[in-house]
Amino acid sequence: MDLENKVKKMGLGHEQGFGAPCLKCKEKCEGFELHFWRKICRNCKCGQEEHDVLLSNEEDRKVGKLFEDTKYTTLIAKLKSDGIPMYKRNVMILTNPVAAKKNVSINTVTYEWAPPVQNQALARQYMQMLPKEKQPVAGSEGAQYRKKQLAKQLPAHDQDPSKCHELSPREVKEMEQFVKKYKSEALGVGDVKLPCEMDAQGPKQMNIPGGDRSTPAAVGAMEDKSAEHKRTQYSCYCCKLSMKEGDPAIYAERAGYDKLWHPACFVCSTCHELLVDMIYFWKNEKLYCGRHYCDSEKPRCAGCDELIFSNEYTQAENQNWHLKHFCCFDCDSILAGEIYVMVNDKPVCKPCYVKNHAVVCQGCHNAIDPEVQRVTYNNFSWHASTECFLCSCCSKCLIGQKFMPVEGMVFCSVECKKMMS
């Protein structure tokens, strides 16, 4: 398929999850409706991951596409119908007998994802070493956490040009080259094993607790029991604490088998969140999630959340923007050359600010223009003018004067305050 056809097929999937309730805003949101290019709900401004959208198939397609043309093809299966690679997520079901007064019932726990290891006891240990609120038990807080991290750490628009907004043929080609490069140089999946199992797989090395580098264990005919003991001492590459004997560890092949992590320490070095499904990107001796690895390589548009492959873009408020996406967060009008106000780190045009966000003057009860000086005390504001900032009793101008605030009113003296009591 040529580039022109790829561009024509692009779409953001606006029908996906349409009308789903927002788990954050509750009834304040009318239901999920994807913004044309912002990757957020048009109604409540929250992301799709904050809504009760069933995305398991979509997420499996996304991760499947990520692993396509890599050494991790064993983790995917192609559908016979359309040839789309699907992520073969390992689901683990554990049955635990629960003793009651008379009978013994069976308690079944389903994990929406588990490390793909043959030893189920090892997988169970791995899960138990994660914080309870992050264990992906079906229907739990941990499952919701995993869903959010899949969306946050591995955005589909970081790997698939068809999920991006109006890329040019040149940008499509550059993005495809970028994705191919990170698949071959950085992408990896963690491997859960017992540290002692790695002796035959990697060099006989150890991590010294408190140190950053691993040191070869002493070998030779004169090896004593002390050296033998040292060789079995392993420490976590992240927290530097020792690994307990018999506890599972995570290895990252791109990092080398002399490094290992506690399950709860296998996190992105930027956002410090658990690397979802142990999918990592390795760069400069650090682990990254997909999002923050890409951020370290390319600028990201603060408007559409996509990586910028264009040679021309703008910078404002310490953020990067596609030229066409430096827009008002409320009405989408272009802000280049216009007055705007930052509201919760989002640019808003002057008319929208006055209409939706401006504070109201306690004196005249009109919105205060962002360019006009004002007086603020606690949650109350006034125009800094002789017409508005006045004594609530005698109307004396209080600019530059001492005043007594009382529930949204201001007084020039105790006498005036008493008269209004």
UniProtKB/Swiss-Prot annotation:
One of its GO terms (cellular component) is focal adhesion. Residues 234-297, 299-359, 362-421 form the LIM zinc-binding domain. Signal peptide: none annotated. It comes from the Eukaryota. Disulfide bonds: none annotated. Residues 92-199 form the PET domain. It is found in: Cytoplasm; Cell junction, Focal adhesion. GO terms for biological process: negative regulation of cell population proliferation. Residues 133-164 are annotated as: Disordered. Its main location: cytoplasm. SUPFAM superfamilies: Glucocorticoid receptor-like (DNA-binding domain). One of its GO terms (molecular function) is zinc ion binding. Keywords: Cell junction, Cytoplasm, LIM domain, Metal-binding, Repeat, Zinc. Residues 155-164 have a biased composition (Basic and acidic residues). PROSITE patterns: LIM_DOMAIN_1, LIM_DOMAIN_2, PET. Interacts via LIM domain 1 with ZYX. Interacts (via LIM domain 3) with ENAH and VASP. Interacts with ALKBH4, talin, actin, alpha-actinin, GRIP1 and PXN. Interacts (via LIM domain 2) with ACTL7A (via N-terminus). Heterodimer with ACTL7A; the heterodimer interacts with ENAH to form a heterotrimer. Belongs to the prickle / espinas / testin family. The N-terminal and the C-terminal halves of the protein can associate with each other, thereby hindering interactions with ZYX. PANTHER family: LIM DOMAIN-CONTAINING PROTEIN, TESTIN. Scaffold protein that may play a role in cell adhesion, cell spreading and in the reorganization of the actin cytoskeleton. Plays a role in the regulation of cell proliferation. May act as a tumor suppressor. This is Testin.
